[in-house]
Amino acid sequence: MSRNTEELQGISLLGNQKTRYPTGYAPEILEAFDNKHPDNDYFVKFVCPEFTSLCPMTGQPDFATIYIRYIPHIKMVESKSLKLYLFSFRNHGDFHEDCVNIIMKDLIALMDPKYIEVFGEFTPRGGIAIHPFANYGKAGTEFEALARKRLFEHDAQ
């Protein structure tokens, strides 16, 4: 059940030896491919331990591990494009909470998943660690209720 060339059209970054790293926020770099199992509900999880953004006030770097979990529908995010997209935040000035919500919204726009959650585990600055959590469940489905439930239980992980 290998993927054929036609199914891989639109994937341009994976395997490209001349990778160009974006110098600014670049949601357009995200690429998607078809989910071969849209009738199965399953989680895909990414752990991204090298996320960096800038404080919008001081310009100082902020570091985080970003956790992305989603239940795909028709489309899935290609991992190298996700890596480059997350790298594009390196020179982007935004608060931790904004970064997590932007990542979630960009991935929703790309994939239209059944469910998605993004959790940012930012390293402490000034003695305070900020851990924003954002999620979404497709309206009118069981995943809308899942999102509500997970929102209030996410700290129990």
UniProtKB/Swiss-Prot annotation:
EC main group: oxidoreductase
Subcellular location: Cytoplasm
Assigned keywords, A-Z: Cytoplasm, NADP, Oxidoreductase, Queuosine biosynthesis
InterPro entries given in the database record: GTP-CH-I_C/QueF (IPR043133), NADPH_dep_7-cyano-7-deazaG_red (IPR050084), QueF (IPR029500), QueF_type1 (IPR016856)
An example Gene Ontology molecular-function term: preQ1 synthase activity
Active site: 55, 62
Cross-referenced Pfam families: QueF
Pathway where this protein functions: tRNA modification; tRNA-queuosine biosynthesis
Binding site for substrate: 77-79, 96-97
Catalytic activity as recorded in UniProt: 7-aminomethyl-7-carbaguanine + 2 NADP(+) = 7-cyano-7-deazaguanine + 2 NADPH + 3 H(+)
Enzyme Commission numbers on file: 1.7.1.13
GO cellular component: cytoplasm
GO aspect biological process, one term: tRNA modification
Coarse class of the protein's main subcellular location: cytoplasm
UniProt record similarity statement: Belongs to the GTP cyclohydrolase I family. QueF type 1 subfamily.
PANTHER family, sorted: NADPH-DEPENDENT 7-CYANO-7-DEAZAGUANINE REDUCTASE
Alphabetized HAMAP family for the sequence: QueF_type1
NCBIfam families found in the cross-reference section: QueF-II
Role description: Catalyzes the NADPH-dependent reduction of 7-cyano-7-deazaguanine (preQ0) to 7-aminomethyl-7-deazaguanine (preQ1).
Protein name: NADPH-dependent 7-cyano-7-deazaguanine reductase
Source organism of the structure: Neisseria meningitidis serogroup A / serotype 4A (strain DSM 15465 / Z2491)
Gene: queF
